[in-house]
Amino acid sequence: MRTAIFADLHDNYTGLTTVLEDAADQKVDRFVFLGDAGHQPRILAALQVRKIPCVYGNWEVSGLRRFPEALAEWVGAWPAILHEDGIVYCHASPDMPAALPTTAVAADWMKPGMSWSALFPRLHQNTNAVWNALAWMETHDVTIAFHGHTHVQMVWVWELATNQLRSFASLERVRLAPGTRTIVGVGSAGVPEDGPWPRYAIYDDDARIVLMRCLRDD
């Protein structure tokens, strides 16, 4: 199965349609969205009508009460993570508090003055958070984690036998190797910070390959 994973639209409807069109050209079988859609109802409606599985990000938590009632009920039920066989999808890190399973619960829990970074760390700037994510993956027997939030594409590969952690930017393809745990930052479809073009990832679980898509105009 080929899964297109994208994140961080931040009200960029053109970014959404660009990713959807490219992914269709790449013959993906399904989509997963990793949070921070924005506050435009039409973006949320586009995700909803396509029945795209979504996890919540900080924008959903902070903006939940701005949405129309029907959308708020749907977004409020988004989970913190999607955990499949050997795979996890999350906004910032899979190491999320078990007490915050949905957007609505997280929105009720957050109070003024609380640190967003504690709940949504930026992995490319926080090595401890990377190791916490890898520890969660090891505990839950997860081989690969996909995340957004950082707005950059980046990959971490932890080799279990040597305890060596390597990070990579600007990769076009990642092949999952035995005896490793891999974290993939899919980049931003709406507001990328590693260039002006929308970015996302495609995971082919049969080939065990991740394609890092960068949608240049040319």
Model-derived regions, located:
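Alpha/beta-hydrolase fold active-site loops
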Residues: 1, 87, 181
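N-terminal active-site segment of His-dependent metallophosphoesterases
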Residues: 1-50
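Acidic, His/Gly-rich catalytic cores of divalent-metal-dependent hydrolytic chemistry
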Residues: 4, 144, 156-218
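Active-site metal-binding loops of divalent metal-dependent hydrolases
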Residues: 7-9, 35-38, 58-60, 92-94, ...
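Glycine-rich phosphate-binding loop signature in dinucleotide/nucleotide-binding domains
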Residues: 23-28, 84, 138-141, 202
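Short hydrophobic/aromatic-enriched beta-strand-loop microsegments
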Residues: 30, 52-58, 164-169
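A short, flexible low-complexity segment enriched in Lys/Arg and Gly/Pro that occurs
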Residues: 33-38, 122-129, 160-172
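Conserved catalytic scaffold of divalent metal-dependent phosphoesterases
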Residues: 41-146, 150, 154-159
